[in-house]
Amino acid sequence: MTALFENPTHNLEAQGLRCPEPVMMVRKTVRKMEEGETLLILADDPSTTRDIPSFCRFMDHTLVAADTETLPYRFLIRKGSN
């Protein structure tokens, strides 16, 4: 699974931030991305384990991978549902 997190198009460092800041930053970053680009998010707020997958479903983006077993949590999303 580690290979999935290599070479994202964009990176977002959200460690130390608390709800709702991480998802707000994800939304702002994704708005500037092109369709199909990827974003690697590093976070340590437990609420991101439900908020980021929910954001992807609600906004029709793809959650490519999530690693929430250890800190920092890692999420890889692709803009759009392709």
UniProtKB/Swiss-Prot annotation:
Entry keywords, A to Z: Cytoplasm
Keyword Membrane: no
Subcellular location: Cytoplasm
GO CC terms: cytoplasm
Residues at the catalytic site: 19
GO molecular-function terms, A-Z: sulfur carrier activity
Example of a GO biological process term: tRNA wobble position uridine thiolation
Predominant localisation class: cytoplasm
HAMAP family, A to Z: Thiourid_synth_A
Function text: Sulfur carrier protein which probably makes part of a sulfur-relay system.
Family listed: Belongs to the sulfur carrier protein TusA family.
PANTHER family found in the cross-reference section: SULFUR CARRIER PROTEIN TUSA, SULFUR CARRIER PROTEIN YEDF-RELATED
UniProt protein name: Sulfur carrier protein TusA
The encoding gene: tusA
